[in-house]
């Protein structure tokens, strides 16, 4: 068993028996999304019930050259299902994503 499961997820589930689902969130700017990001997403998807990438719609070149739609297109070409890419005002706070789940029975793990 890996450290994420052993040190984070397992204790959450043991301390909170009402938790039925663990959602992994990989947030970032992803300007651009590269193979190392994809590898991290695939790893996360194997550890949790549902895995998502959260990113913003900020486009301010040169540091932020891609908007959300462009990022989704790029990530999808690399193999991330488009329904697993969520737009957030801040990619490190999955507010929109959290609305899709029951807060009493879902735990969120951010990587």
Q: Model-found features: residue ranges?
A:
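Nucleotidyltransferase catalytic core that binds NTPs
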Residues: 3-111
């Amino acid at each position: 068993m890996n450290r994420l499961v052993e040190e984070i997820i397992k204790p959450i589930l043991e301390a909170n028996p009402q938790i039925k689902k663990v959602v992994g969130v990989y947030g970032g700017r992803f300007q651009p999304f590269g193979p190392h990001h994809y590898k991290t997403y695939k790893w996360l998807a194997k550890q949790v019930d549902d895995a998502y990438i959260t990113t913003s719609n900020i486009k301010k070149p040169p540091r932020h050259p891609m908007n959300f739609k462009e990022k989704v297109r790029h990530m999808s070409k690399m193999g991330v299902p488009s329904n697993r890419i969520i737009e957030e005002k801040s990619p490190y706070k999955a507010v929109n994503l959290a609305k899709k789940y029951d807060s009493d029975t879902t735990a969120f793990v951010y990587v």
